[in-house]
């Protein structure tokens, strides 16, 4: 046991270069083994662990992944029939064409909010002092007309 510990202690410093911690394979079991393709003959070698993308390595089919021709359509039909069922909430009901993103204005929504009549502007005289409200140019024109 102590020899083994000495060997491990040596390995990090100047010890045998194949036991250095920087070598690629960490465990001695891997150092001595030949690659698996050489152990077995070419006849015995597996083709590939996953021959097609829908089979997993231990050879069980994954039924949710395989695409049998009717399956996706069956799901769609199920979903649609749920959408068309009479008791379904209305958000699942199918509309023939998608609604436009910007709502087109309805007839009833033409009113403008505010207490003014359409076509007349709101009286804003109380915002201004009387000197701001009188128009000197109009006064000059009126004087010119009277002359």
UniProtKB/Swiss-Prot annotation:
Transmembrane segments: none annotated. Coiled coil: none annotated. Residues 20-36, 45-57, 74-88 have a biased composition (Polar residues). Keywords: Developmental protein. It holds the Pfam family MPLKIP. It comes from the Eukaryota. Residues 1-119 are annotated as: Disordered. InterPro entries: TTDN1/SICKLE. The keyword Protein biosynthesis does not apply. This is Gastrula-specific protein 17. It comes from Xenopus laevis.
